[in-house]
Amino acid sequence: MSHYHEQFLKQNPLAVLGVLRDLHKAAIPLRLSWNGGQLISKLLAITPDKLVLDFGSQAEDNIAVLKAQHITITAETQGAKVEFTVEQLQQSEYLQLPAFITVPPPTLWFVQRRRYFRISAPLHPPYFCQTKLADNSTLRFRLYDLSLGGMGALLETAKPAELQEGMRFAQIEVNMGQWGVFHFDAQLISISERKVIDGKNETITTPRLSFRFLNVSPTVERQLQRIIFSLEREAREKADKVRD
């Protein structure tokens, strides 16, 4: 997660505690990962100087994590991904049941997801995508916008009759120029229309596709994050030049 943009790093103690309290209140599952293992837990209690975590379901994992150092804790909420590291866990009790305790982290990553960050793809050069339909024909389209959770695309031809919302596609090829070629499993969430007025004051209607990415690996997610912020920076620089 250190590869994410620094704006996602929470360093204020009150902000860190606020995120942790939200995880506790919503009973969000936590994944504890260390060198050689992982387990699923949840926050049982939180104070400014103590975190109480539930024991995992497997005794051998609980024993192993107590011996581990530099434990990474991650959580997935509807709007964000949370990740932080603690140096070590100690065994304790909570409500007369075994539990882990540790001190709250000084910082944590709070990476906001799809509905918060969506960046338009550049018009020049355009980024093109392609995938296969059920009849083995090739469907080509242009990347319109991009987020960690999915992408929007524009068809340059009429919508094929067999293209329906809810369809899943394996390994859609997305050519993002200087960033390289990526392949995503994705589900078609919606089909709509993009309408613009051209220079002749005529309405141009283009089929618009919205995809949700499936099974994106952490490595690819980090690459997407870097691309999104680079595109955002380039767009901001162009806007500044126009204003100047």
UniProtKB/Swiss-Prot annotation:
List this protein's GO terms for biological process. bacterial-type flagellum-dependent cell motility; negative regulation of bacterial-type flagellum-dependent cell motility; regulation of bacterial-type flagellum-dependent cell motility by regulation of motor speed
Limits of the PilZ domain: 112-230
Query: What is the name of the protein in this document?
Result: Flagellar brake protein YcgR
Q: Which HAMAP family match?
A: YcgR
Assembly information from the UniProt record: Monomer. Interacts with MotA in the flagellar basal bodies. In another study it was not seen to interact with MotA, but instead with FliM and FliG, also in the flagellar basal body.
Q: GO cellular-component terms in the record?
A: bacterial-type flagellum basal body
KO phenotype (gene knockout):
No visible motility phenotype. Disruption of this gene suppresses the reduced motility of a pdeH disruption, thus the double disruption is motile.
Task: Determine the domain of life of the protein's source.
Answer: Bacteria
Which InterPro entries does the record associate with it?
A: PilZ_domain (IPR009875), Split_barrel_FMN-bd (IPR012349), T3SS_YcgR (IPR023787), T3SS_YcgR_PilZN (IPR009926)
**In which organism is this protein found?**
Escherichia coli (strain K12)
Quote one Gene Ontology molecular function term.
cyclic-di-GMP binding
Record remark on domains: The N-terminal domain is involved in FliG binding, the C-terminal domain is involved in FliM binding.
Q: Which one Pfam family would you cite for this protein?
A: PilZ
Family from the record: Belongs to the YcgR family.
The record's subcellular locations are: Bacterial flagellum basal body
Q: Keywords in UniProt for this one?
A: Bacterial flagellum, c-di-GMP, Nucleotide-binding
Function in brief: Acts as a flagellar brake, regulating swimming and swarming in a bis-(3'-5') cyclic diguanylic acid (c-di-GMP)-dependent manner. When bound to c-di-GMP it binds to elements of the flagellar motor (MotA and/or FliG and FliM, binding to FliM also occurs in the absence of c-di-GMP), causing the motor to slow down. Thus, increasing levels of c-di-GMP lead to decreased motility. Probably binds 1 c-di-GMP dimer per subunit.
Task: List all disulphide bridges recorded for this chain.
Answer: none
